[in-house]
Amino acid sequence: MKSLFYFFERINFLTADFLLKKIRIGADNLKDVSSLDLFFVHMHHRGVAVHNIFLFLLTYVPFFKRAVLGCYLKKKLFIDHDLKNKNYFKMKRANALFFKGDFLTSNNFLRASTTFYNSFFFFLIRNHVITKTTLNAIYFSKGSFKPAETSYYFNAYVLHFFKKNKVNDFIVFLNENKIKDYWAYLTTIYASPEAQNLKLIDPVGSLIEQSNSYADRLPTRRTLRKPAPTQSSMSRLCILLFSLTTPPLKKLRPPLSLRLHSCYP
C-alpha cells in the first residue's frame, strides 16, 4: 500500500507540474510544449474529437489543483485495473484514438512524430513514472488491430523493460539514457524477421502475480488446483512429541451387539 500511495503522490506531482507549466496550445508555441500536447494538436487538425475530460484538461486548462486532479486520477484511471473488467480503464475511448490508422505498418510508430510515440502511455514513461499496475491498466486498445498484433507489441516492450531494469519493486523511475536504449531495442525487434510472424510472448501474467495487487484478485483455477503443502520437519517433530507425551486413551468397550454376537458358536 505504501508503494501504491507513493505512486499516486508522484503522478499527482508530475501531472500538476505539467498542467502548471503548460498554456493553451497555439501555432506560436508548438516548440514549447511536450509531445503529448503535440499529439492533441495533431488529432485536432485531423478532426478527431477527444471525449475524455482528463485529456480535455491536459489540452486546454492551464491550471488545475493537485488535489482535485489526483482524486480524478485515482477514481477514473487506476482503481479498477483488472483486465477482465470492462471498466478497468475509463480512458479506453480516448486511448483508442492513439491507435487509429495504420500506425503499425513499416515501423512508423517508432518515429518521434507518430501517434504511438505521443500517446499517454509513453507520456508516463517519458516522465519517469511507470508501474506494473499502470502497464496492466493502460492496456493497448485493440481498435482495428488483431489481438495477436496488439499483444505482440505490448508484451515485447514489457518483457524487455523488466528484464533490462531487473524490476523487483512496484515503482520504477527511468532516465533519458535508458529510454534511448529502449528505442534502439524496439527498432531492432520490430524490424527483425521474427517480428513478422508475431510470435506471442506473455510476461504480463507473471507480472500480475508478482505485483502487490495480485493479493486482491480472486483465486483462479490454477491456484485452486495447487496441491496441499507438505508437512515440514518441525511439524512432524511436534506431532511425534505430542503423541509421546499424551497419555493413551482408555480402551473402549465393544458395543453390545458385538458382545452378543460373540456368544454364538
From Swiss-Prot:
The record's keywords, sorted A to Z, are:
Mitochondrion
- Where is the protein localized? Mitochondrion
Give the chief site where it resides: mitochondrion
Domain of life here? Eukaryota
Give me the Gene Ontology terms describing cellular component.
mitochondrion
What is this protein's name? Uncharacterized mitochondrial protein ORF12
